[in-house]
UniProtKB/Swiss-Prot annotation:
Location (main, coarse): plastid
Similarity remark: Belongs to the complex I subunit 2 family.
EC class: translocase
Gene: ndhB
Catalytic activity: a plastoquinone + NADH + (n+1) H(+)(in) = a plastoquinol + NAD(+) + n H(+)(out); a plastoquinone + NADPH + (n+1) H(+)(in) = a plastoquinol + NADP(+) + n H(+)(out)
Membrane-traversing stretches: 15-35, 39-59, 84-104, 113-133, 137-157, 172-192, 217-237, 249-269, 283-303, 339-359, 382-402, 418-438, 471-491
Name of one Pfam family that matches: Ndh2_N
Taxonomic source organism: Nephroselmis olivacea
Protein name: NAD(P)H-quinone oxidoreductase subunit 2, chloroplastic
Membrane topology note: Multi-pass membrane protein
Places the protein is found: Plastid, Chloroplast thylakoid membrane
Amino acid sequence: MELSDILASFHASNLIPEGIVACTILLVLLLDLVYSRTCHAWLAWVAMAGLSLASVLLGQQWYQLMNLPTATMTFGGSFQADSLSLVFRAIIAMSCVLCILLSIDYVESTGTAPSEFLVLIATASLGGMLVAGSNDLLMMFVSLETLGLASYLLTGYMKRDVRSNEASLKYLLVGAASSGLFLYGISWMYGISGGHMELNSIAHAIVSLDETKTTTCALALVLMTVGVGFKVAAAPFHQWTPDVYQGSPTPVVAFLSVGSKAAGFILAVRMCTTLFPSFNTEWHLIFTILSILSMIVGNFIAVTQTSLKRMLGYSSVGQAGVMMIGMLTDSPDGYASLIVYLLIYLFMNLGAFACVILFGLRTGTDQIQDYSGLLARDPFLALCLSLCLLSLGGIPPLAGFFGKMYLFLAAWDAGQYSLVWVGLITSVVSIYYYLSVVKIMLVPATQEMSLAVREYPRRAWSLEPIQPLEVGIFVCVLGSILVGVAGNSMVNLMTITMSQAPSLGV
């Protein structure tokens, strides 16, 4: 076989988007080395351009795959570029683009070098994209650790901030423990399967195991679920979430809440549908428990929080439980609803964090009571934050309502009645704490303004001067509205996409 034939057999073109992200990382490092401080103003735009190009190419690959099915296995089966992976890789890349846009003003205000932040967040995005397509145990673990290590460094980006250092240490310790358990689980699967690395090969090898080895496989499933639960911030593996969310730089928290969560969910889907299809009952039971626990713990504890970042942290735990409902339906409709809700969540959650960043830059606080009377000082910020929070709560006619509706309908059709009822009840609880923040912001009485808002610079409705952060807020709010309006069409499109994903087997 000639070299050209060998290279063609790798189907390396499927990894061009990841190659572009890697080249973008190297370009940012090179520009910072050559031009130093003179390039700081436009380094972020270079990084966003590279990640945006990767997103566009992923969209093009998805379109080609839908119209003309091609080989999706890359590098000897270690990477699978099927329709499922293409969608999740695009979501992770888009979340990174938006997080960089939201971070420009924040990083500038700290006086730190933007190149470090950009390289780390792009590396985390690259790791997440590789997780989305990983099809063997080695690729899965290395990609997951690429995402994890970059995330640990991002949480400690503010080196002189004690809270940031504390958050980074907690995240590192809990992450290392969960990674160790995950690695222990995949090592068991490697041994039991007779030395296979590819997920499909392992799945075929464990179908006809004796009772002892079947029990070992079930234990491996539990161990690997711990690693997944950590990534998606699901209860009871959520203990790191509130402290890391409160102590880390807010743009980093925004990425962890969407990009890392998306990578965790595609990992869970790959693990359950490709690696453990013969343990369908077991993984359904495990993730049903995680879903119910996450929705109850996340939403009820969020009610008691006084910090908006901590509240959003516990909210993300509850949202993880809601997203698991889509996975537990084990149908194209359910997976499609999960993807559409994740896309809606991307915009509304990043929009909420963008508003927190902007308010924090102008006041230096993230306490909920300090938002009191914000409408009188900054109507744009108050309105945008209100829309994002109400959408997260699932208030109609906002996008979050339609996202949850599609998930609950798919679950109801699949017979998951208990999950739907728990989801509905905890959604009502979430509406309470989201509305409490909105009420605080919209009180008209001047005497009820917090000290932070009284000293807040009055902002008029104008386009000049407009900051990148304000552009990001507008994009997130607009994105959540548009996805909500086109929700039914997107669910239908994603249902067709998921039905063509061979790894799902649905």
